[in-house]
């Protein structure tokens, strides 16, 4: 969801101890559930020579319940918040689009899954998602930088808690810590 001006995504992740305490923190801070817990499967695509990755770009196909979404993300801008161009397109059939991507020379390079619950607040210009992944629980705050900073502080987090890495990068770090060979960030592959 692109909540910032134009087609720019501005966000941070925050590590949470577990889904239950993270949900309780949000609910007691005035947030309410906007979209119930939903399983997402995400597949990143690139060319055989990894042109998108080299350019700092990403092409993702997401299946989330009855919704399929194609997302392009441009190179990130360094800073305390993750900021990058984001273009999204709702698809009627992820399977058909997978075939189109294949015919165009794109191949799947990384799969990851998570359970996502979306939270919001009536007076809030931003959104918070609670992501349960095979490598841990995260809160993702998306909106304008001031809203992100104010919301993170209101939830008891400090700027040094901000994570701007992608789930792919976090997964590679997790594999290194666990002394595991990287594969895909799925429940089956992570042994979660």
Where are these regions (language model features)?
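N-terminal strand-loop-strand beta-hairpin
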Residues: 1-126, 161-192
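Short amphipathic alpha-helical "recognition" segments used for binding
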Residues: 15, 144-146
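Beta-strand-connecting loop/turn residues
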Residues: 66, 135-137
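A short beta-strand motif that forms part of the nucleic acid-binding face
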Residues: 74, 134, 145
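C-terminal accessory/tail domains of diverse enzymes
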Residues: 128, 147-150, 192
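A contiguous pocket-lining binding segment that forms or flanks enzyme active sites
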Residues: 128-135
